[in-house]
From Swiss-Prot:
GO terms under biological process: protoporphyrinogen IX biosynthetic process
Organism: Helicobacter pylori (strain P12)
Subunit note: Homodimer.
Chief subcellular location: cytoplasm
InterPro entries per record: 4pyrrol_synth_GluAld_NH2Trfase, Aminotrans_3, Aminotrans_3_PPA_site, PyrdxlP-dep_Trfase, PyrdxlP-dep_Trfase_major, PyrdxlP-dep_Trfase_small
Family, per entry: Belongs to the class-III pyridoxal-phosphate-dependent aminotransferase family. HemL subfamily.
Recorded GO MF terms: glutamate-1-semialdehyde 2,1-aminomutase activity; pyridoxal phosphate binding; transaminase activity
Keywords: Cytoplasm, Isomerase, Porphyrin biosynthesis, Pyridoxal phosphate
Location of this chain's protein in the cell: Cytoplasm
Superkingdom of this protein's organism: Bacteria
Cofactor entry: pyridoxal 5'-phosphate
CDD domains noted in UniProt: OAT_like (cd00610)
Protein name, entry field: Glutamate-1-semialdehyde 2,1-aminomutase
EC number: 5.4.3.8
Amino acid sequence: MELLHSINDFNEAKQVIAGGVNSPVRAFKSVKGTPPFILKGKGAYLYDVDNNHYIDFVQSWGPLIFGHADEEIEENIINTLKKGTSFGAPTELETTLAKEIISCYEGLDKVRLVNSGTEATMSAIRLARAYSQKDDLIKFEGCYHGHSDSLLVKAGSGCATFGSPSSLGVPNDFSKHTLVARYNDLNSTEECFKKGDVGCVIIEPIAGNMGLVPAQKEFLLGLKALCEKYQAVLILDEVMSGFRASLSGSQEFYGVVPDLVTFGKVIGAGLPLACFGGRAEIMDLLSPIGGVYQAGTLSGNPLAVCAGLSALYKIKRDKTLYTRLNALAVRLTQGLKRSAQNYNIALETLNRGSMFGFFFNENAVCDFDDALKSDTEMFAKFHQKMLFKGVYLACSSFETGFICEPMTEEMIDLVVAKADESFDEIIKGV
């Protein structure tokens, strides 16, 4: 496999785009590689400018539960496009999508559509602070909630990939209101409650930005109880896990009803769309009927709303979708672990629905400290081997992988075989 055109394209991009990419992880820096420049995608496959093709386990970082260029979703987008790209005015589609989202999630009375997960979490926190009338926020080590200033403290995703505990340019006056607790640790969490005047808590119930690290059920239930005890608003960030891990996101596994929740990725089916929502008494604080301001020129964009609505309709029609995706994820993770064991390579694997993760680690990963003990050098070698064998994995050990509907058992078995070849070559130093 060659990447000559991608190398040239990347060098050209670096002349006019900061870092050559529009989101840091895409640069392949942590795996010491060159990112393939993508020409197109179809189903489970990506095709690059060098005429290479890959089985894609990134799926645009999660949104594409039906794979690339799904014909039904594509056709609906095209039909909507013919009517106009954006109006800056209400449409019936927005109301329909809101109803579909609300119908899947317990405790969700109203939503507000936005353009990105960052907007959703940022807006939810502003709303929670207004409702609680308290400024301090608790987040958890390794959880990533977008790149708004108050949340870039001990974050996962790119911040973990590049070894940054926070970000330059974030004033201390912003970060001083952010208290950081250990994931899956109630004692650490209650200590944070005691330190500050905590108005809200935000958490990924199925963390996907320090690798895949699900919350323990007793921890999440205990966190809900602590929020009630200290009168803080509980925000579940389900931008990644919502409609991915299951139709009801984390609620399928934990049954926890938050005060506010954020969704993204799948609800936009690959176009820019996210939302936040929750109890009516909180949501009604939003302008224009309340005093909490939030706005967006392209919020509720008809193309994104149409794409998301098409995806949700397909999801709801397919009664066995999540069962099939989960089975493929289990087949993959068990296969990877079995192959690693054949070469005495320490590998921990797990999945939640169509989300999966693996760590080159001897022990189970329960929090950010555990994740940071993983062998990132081994991951980089494995990633490069798999890429050149036609398997497109997330280019950081601190990201989650995704199964899509067009994938088959035969594809998964092929990937496991390629993993076996890769481990063999790594051990032999080839």
